[in-house]
């Protein structure tokens, strides 16, 4: 259980760092928002696994300590999600904010805009047309990146669910084997096999995280 708790603490710290980056630059790229969303899902899944293990420990001082940790982590995850939603909502309004701030310089801005329009028109491409094309390109790139991040998130959720299923199956098998009188040596061999499956799971998860990181680095 301590290993899961330590892992959740690390995930929480990384998530806070990403949220701080988002807060420093409200108009953050969609790649950063996708990274935060994935980190939130990972933290919530880890908390669920930790909570499931705590529920199996019964009662006592040790169980109470871990239950308190689960509550603290759950509150942190909920607070992080609320903060992320607030920052994401704020990032949708940077253009309106900038327009209001630039109001006192309206005359100068109009003259500059007229000059830019004249220059672009002379080249055969009005300013608004160039902006529209640029926005379309950005929209297509963002949609592609969102699709990649969505696939990564779904893969992460599937892998976490498979890991939970393996844990439940292993626990049931051990209980059944002890009931049938199977020797501890045999149960240990089964346990080693389960550990190999866990190693495969975590290796796959690591590769997925690395892949998402490079996608964000390239497109973010």
Swiss-Prot record:
GO BP term, example: intracellular protein transport
Residue ranges that the UniProt entry lists as topological domain Vesicular: 220
Chief place where the protein resides: Golgi
GO molecular function: SNAP receptor activity; SNARE binding
Keywords: Endoplasmic reticulum, ER-Golgi transport, Golgi apparatus, Membrane, Protein transport, Transmembrane, Transmembrane helix, Transport
Cytoplasmic side: 1-198
Membrane-traversing stretches: 199-219
Membrane topology: Single-pass type IV membrane protein
Localisation: Golgi apparatus membrane; Endoplasmic reticulum membrane
Keyword NADP: no
Cellular component terms (Gene Ontology): endoplasmic reticulum membrane; ER to Golgi transport vesicle membrane; Golgi apparatus; Golgi membrane; late endosome membrane; SNARE complex
Biological function: SNARE required for protein transport between the ER and the Golgi complex.
Family indicated by similarity: Belongs to the BOS1 family.
The protein, known as: Protein transport protein BOS1
